[in-house]
UniProtKB/Swiss-Prot annotation:
Disulfide bonds: C92-C417, C124-C129, C183-C230, C232-C237, C278-C291, C280-C289, C318-C337, C421-C447
Glycosylated residues in this chain: N61, N69, N70, N86, N146, N200, N234, N402
Transcription regulation as UniProt keyword: no
Span list, region Disordered: 323-350
Domain writeup: Intact N-terminus is essential for virion morphogenesis. Possesses two apical sorting signals, one in the ectodomain, which is likely to be a glycan, and the other in the transmembrane domain. The transmembrane domain also plays a role in lipid raft association.
Record-given protein name: Neuraminidase
Note: The influenza A genome consist of 8 RNA segments. Genetic variation of hemagglutinin and/or neuraminidase genes results in the emergence of new influenza strains. The mechanism of variation can be the result of point mutations or the result of genetic reassortment between segments of two different strains.
Catalytic activity as recorded in UniProt: Hydrolysis of alpha-(2->3)-, alpha-(2->6)-, alpha-(2->8)- glycosidic linkages of terminal sialic acid residues in oligosaccharides, glycoproteins, glycolipids, colominic acid and synthetic substrates
Lineage, broadest ranks: Viruses, Riboviria, Orthornavirae, Negarnaviricota, Polyploviricotina
Virion surface domain ranges by topology: 31-469
Means of activity regulation: Inhibited by the neuraminidase inhibitors zanamivir (Relenza) and oseltamivir (Tamiflu). These drugs interfere with the release of progeny virus from infected cells and are effective against all influenza strains. Resistance to neuraminidase inhibitors is quite rare.
Family: Belongs to the glycosyl hydrolase 34 family.
Entry's localization field: Virion membrane; Host apical cell membrane
Cofactor(s) the protein needs: Ca(2+)
Gene transcribed to yield this protein: NA
Amino acid sequence: MNPNQKIITIGSVSLTIATVCFLMQIAILVTTVTLHFRQYECDSPANNQVMPCEPTIIERNITEIVYLNNTTIEKEICPKLVEYRNWSKPQCKITGFAPFSKDNSIRLSAGGDIWVTREPYVSCDPGKCYQFALGQGTTLDNKHSNDTIHDRIPHRTLLMNELGVPFHLGTRQVCIAWSSSSCHDGKAWLHVCVTGDDKNATASFIYDGRLVDSIGSWSQNILRTQESECVCINGTCTVVMTDGSASGRADTRILFIEEGKIVHISPLSGSAQHVEECSCYPRYPGVRCICRDNWKGSNRPVVDINVEDYSIDSSYVCSGLVGDTPRNNDRSSNSNCRNPNNERGNHGVKGWAFDDGNDVWMGRTISKDLRSGYETFKVIGGWSTPNSKSQINRQVIVDSDNRSGYSGIFSVEGKSCINRCFYVELIRGREQETRVWWTSNSIVVFCGTSGTYGTGSWPDGADINLMPI
């Protein structure tokens, strides 16, 4: 090859390499610009339309680093959109309940600064469970704890902690309340907080940390709500509220709330005569509540809520083994599914039950007269057959020698089904334990299991003689 041919060949190769490098630089530039603009867009699986990432609530923010020819490109991966909960999965099949959590608040109060509380409950967001209670504006080892047996004072606030964390001095006070309910719609927490004068109380609706709506007393007689979790389906949350006599006719209404705003109010309808302190759970596409009849019945009222058309129906749990306290003994107690049984109906205690086909799972105090002990069991035909009394799978949660109190339900969504859990309030102090001047509680929590389980008793466990007076 002569010198001229060499020069031409080298020049051609150099030109080819230069062209390839130029095209690569253009490709890198186009890729960089494309990825820069695409980080603010993501595909919506619902309708295949491009949706902006920035205004959506995200669960996680992942940055993926891509290396191209010594050029670093940061690509933001659009996260999964947070959606409203719809609770459409089936209810888990269970054989009974297994221990889940216990906060030991009273025992810890003997040597630490723990809030005086009552009316506890549990509710979960999509990732974590929390315990709530109504604080008395004081810790136990504090003279302000004297005479905290009273339910309604302006210093009471709703407390919120991660489940299993006692209400210490650093606990968040969510709102002012002597009656409350809380639930998570999949995007944010809703808190319903009642406080004020007995004859003119106010319910505040706090959503995502902001007060959005309110409603005043409609019967001027202690406006009150569930003292356990409300339920949200597809962005609509339902809460049962009562205003009126605690031992006679009262005005119960079901409020429908969307992102903290009241969108509809339905009156109670059906055959229930008195409804208070409902324990509610999702029963897709609606909500079902098991409540307290403080007037006529020791059998528990059932309230069925249609979230789509706002209609309400009510009845009573069919089981002849009734759930309220006080009550008749099991041999003489009755329930016909439709009406209060007129058996020791005046007074009562918050409780829970839930349907399982034609059967019913329920919890109640072991004592038929006092808030002592706690048991759970399943009643065959207890949801569909009047006065059914065939009991199976009984468990003792708190032995009969120890105090209990309110109890309620909460639901946890798993990968394939919705599990039912319950808590029991373990009251200590006045009125029964007169050595001390305070009244407070701890809690124990159980959840449904499809496995096997053993036996035991999980009382509060504090020695009252070691407690501050």
